[in-house]
Structures are given as structure tokens and as C-alpha cells.
Regions:
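Short glycine-rich, flexible loops that bind phosphorylated cofactors or substrates
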Residues: 180-181, 210
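A short, conserved alpha-helix within the catalytic core of class I
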Residues: 181-190
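Conserved N-terminal segment of class I S-adenosyl-L-methionine
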Residues: 1-167, 188, 204-205, 211-253
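A conserved beta-strand element that flanks and buttresses the S-adenosyl-L-methionine
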Residues: 173
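Hydrophobic adenine-recognition pocket in adenosine-nucleotide-binding enzymes
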Residues: 177
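Helix-to-beta-strand junctions that scaffold the AdoMet/dcAdoMet cofactor pocket
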Residues: 181-182, 195-197
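Conserved beta-strand signature within the Rossmann-like core of class I S-adenosyl-L-methionine
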Residues: 198-206
Length: 255
């Protein structure tokens, strides 16, 4: 579920994209990959997609370490995420930051290439940003793209209960994450504990077990959603009986 302004902004960027504009994503990739052209991008993207389609099945994957290694075995997901998120807008999240004040703390949990932080940072330069993800090519790209900004930090979770947050946040996003971890209930509890009173959480959790959408995650989905709905005030709630993607919005009570 996205706001009307987000959808309108996305439509505008899609129009620019069709006209050959909105190429900031390609400029970043070109700088990172030392002169990557649009033609080279499509060659690498196409070959990478074909390779990634069989990557999961190439080795036995039954432990958390096995699952985590999948995302470190190819840089295809850098290309895919930069392309996939090229037209995204986050006015709804920005409105939440604006209400919190000129300064604050934002965490993009499970950031990948950090598309949300990339959109927000220039609009809220006085905020402090924390990126969290596994040590993968995506996180290395995110680290590189914010290398000049001292108000952006990067954290990596350990295994199991070794989770990385140490301070409190006004806004946390945890989008397209929970279905990929073995311990979504533990992750959500960790995130909720590190929300400031009155802080906002944007989160989703699809149910589509198989491959990198872990069966371990699906088994905890109902309890995870119950924890969210019991612990936080729902603006837009998740429901266990809705398996499709819903971008939920919660607020931590001030009491």
C-alpha cells in the first residue's frame, strides 16, 4: 500500500525513464563499475539474472550460513535493485520524518543497496542514518554510495540472536526482509525494542515459502504479525490471513 503522492511521483519518473531521463541510477553504477554503459548494464544484468535463477539450487542450503551465503555469491542483486528501485518515491516515509523534526534517527533494516536512504538523505541532511544488512555485494555498494557522508553508518547482523542495533530510532523500515531470515520473530522484537516512543515502523512480510523465501520464516509469520499488532499501534496493519505484500505502518506507543 503506497500513498497517492508516492504513486504520482513514480508515474512521473516512469515517464522520464521512457523519455531517456531519470538516469541517476545508471550514473552511480557507471562510477562504481568504472564506466559501465547502458549496453554493458543490460548484458551483465541478463547474464546475471540467468545465473542467479539457478544459484540457489547449486548447493545444499539448510543452515543460516548457507542461506546467507546465497546473497554473497553474485553481484547481480546490485544491478537488479538499482534498476528495480529507480522510479521509487518515499513521500509517505518522508512525511513521518518531517513530523519527527529537523533532526532524528532513521534505520533501513535489510537495506540492500539502500534505496530509501538514498532518497531521504538529501531531503533530510541533518538526520542520522543506519544501514543494516548482511555482508554482501549489495551492502558494499551501499557503503560505497554513502562513503562521503559521516551521518550514515553501516551495521551487519551476526548469526541468530546477534542483532546489530544499539540505539533508538524515530523511524525504521524493514521492507522485503522478514521472509528471507530464519528468525523473523526475533528480528521484529529487536526492531520494536529499538524504536523510540512515538517512533514509526514500516514493515512487510509476504507468505510465499520456497527458495530464498525461507520456510523457517513462513513458520514464524503468524506469531511475528501477532507481536507487531500486540506491541504497536497499527496505522496500516499486517494480517496473517493476507499473504500478498502489504507495506504496513506501525507506531510505538508513548506510554
Amino acid at each position: 500500500m503506497r500513498s497517492y503522492r508516492d504513486l504520482l511521483g513514480r508515474r512521473r519518473l516512469q515517464l522520464l525513464d521512457r523519455l531517456g531521463g531519470n538516469r541517476g541510477w545508471l550514473r552511480e553504477l557507471s562510477e562504481y563499475y568504472r564506466g559501465l554503459t547502458i549496453q554493458e548494464f543490460w548484458v551483465r544484468y541478463t547474464l546475471g539474472r540467468m545465473d542467479a535463477a539457478t544459484l540457489w539450487e547449486r548447493k545444499p542450503r539448510s543452515t543460516e550460513a548457507d542461506y546467507r551465503s546465497f546473497y554473497a555469491e553474485t553481484d547481480y542483486f546490485v544491478l537488479r535493485q538499482m534498476y528495480y528501485h529507480r522510479n521509487d518515491c518515499h513521500h509517505d516515509i518522508a512525511r513521518t520524518l518531517r513530523r519527527a523534526g529537523r533532526e532524528g534517527d532513521f534505520c533501513e533494516y535489510g537495506c540492500g543497496v539502500a534505496p530509501i536512504t538514498a532518497w531521504l538523505r538529501s531531503r533530510f541532511p541533518a538526520w542520522r542514518y543506519t544501514l543494516v544488512d548482511l555482508p554482501t555485494p549489495m551492502l558494499e555498494f551501499a557503503r560505497w554510495r554513502f562513503r562521503k557522508f559521516t551521518n550514515v553508518e553501516v551495521k551487519e547482523p551476526g548469526f541468530g540472536s546477534d542483532l546489530p542495533l544499539t540505539r533508538s530510532y524515530d523511524v525504521i523500515t524493514c521492507l522485503d526482509v522478514l521472509e528471507h531470515v530464519v528468525n523473523p520473530l526475533q528480528v521484529v522484537l529487536h526492531v520494536v525494542e529499538h524504536l523510540k516512543p512515538g517512533g514509526a515502523l514500516y514493515v512487510n512480510f509476504i507468505e510465499a515459502p520456497g527458495g530464498e523465501n525461507l520456510v523457517e520464516a513462513a513458520a514464524q509469520r503468524m506469531d511475528t504479525i501477532k507481536l507487531l499488532n500486540d506491541s504497536l499501534e497499527a496505522i496500516v496493519p499486517l494480517r496473517a490471513d493476507v499473504t500478498a505484500e502489504v507495506n504496513a505502518h506501525y507506531v510505538k506507543p508513548r506510554r
